[in-house]
């Protein structure tokens, strides 16, 4: 049997200002982080673990049968936390692909998680991510919606040129809403972490621009819809309604 060399890591911390204690908020009788964990496990792409600096999060994860790894509290980004967790969980270097899944996607489809791996079939790609087509001007103009700009290289694939909070690209044609889910080659993650923050990254406040400015290749899979993140009380209520209406919280829709 071929050894599975993919690791899904879910960085989680308690520092959200709009929703204090967000990873542990109850959704349908389970902490939000456990819903994300189970959907990652249902994707069936490899080992799954939560990377956290908070013992309460680790306890909640392990109490529900998941794996958690404690990390330092001073990481500047989720990618740094993921890199530390990778080193602790796989010091021998067997893992060659790392998926960084946000801990506030409790209703993400397992199939969406699987799709982020597809661009890495091309050895020239360093990092893979996702985007969905934007259908309203309101979404296109919203600075909280990150737009992915890229050159089409297939029916559902772009080679990333830029990411921005502005409305882009200008003119007629599709625009894409970036989904903050990444798959890294292990060596690409290390290279990314070692790069200094870049000028455009700091101006746009978008970490992925560091990779582009550093000469790394990011490819984007186009998916049908954007997973619902939970950032506000309204988002939380929506997630609760979706979970309540789903046929089974134990076996999420694929």
Swiss-Prot record:
InterPro entries: Cytidylyl_trans, KdsB, Nucleotide-diphossugar_trans
Enzyme nomenclature, EC number: 2.7.7.38
Localization, UniProt: Cytoplasm
Reactions catalysed: 3-deoxy-alpha-D-manno-oct-2-ulosonate + CTP = CMP-3-deoxy-beta-D-manno-octulosonate + diphosphate
CDD domains attached to this UniProt entry: CMP-KDO-Synthetase
Keyword Cytoplasm among record annotations: yes
A molecular function (GO) term: 3-deoxy-manno-octulosonate cytidylyltransferase activity
Keyword terms of this UniProt record: Cytoplasm, Lipopolysaccharide biosynthesis, Nucleotidyltransferase, Transferase
GO BP terms: CMP-keto-3-deoxy-D-manno-octulosonic acid biosynthetic process; lipopolysaccharide biosynthetic process
Cellular component, GO, one term: cytosol
Pathway(s): Nucleotide-sugar biosynthesis; CMP-3-deoxy-D-manno-octulosonate biosynthesis; CMP-3-deoxy-D-manno-octulosonate from 3-deoxy-D-manno-octulosonate and CTP: step 1/1; Bacterial outer membrane biogenesis; lipopolysaccharide biosynthesis
EC class of the enzyme, as a word: transferase
Family: Belongs to the KdsB family.
Functional description taken from the UniProt entry: Activates KDO (a required 8-carbon sugar) for incorporation into bacterial lipopolysaccharide in Gram-negative bacteria.
PANTHER family linked to this entry: 3-DEOXY-MANNO-OCTULOSONATE CYTIDYLYLTRANSFERASE (PTHR42866), 3-DEOXY-MANNO-OCTULOSONATE CYTIDYLYLTRANSFERASE, MITOCHONDRIAL (PTHR42866:SF2)
Protein name, as recorded: 3-deoxy-manno-octulosonate cytidylyltransferase
Organism of provenance: Nitrobacter winogradskyi (strain ATCC 25391 / DSM 10237 / CIP 104748 / NCIMB 11846 / Nb-255)
GN (gene name): kdsB
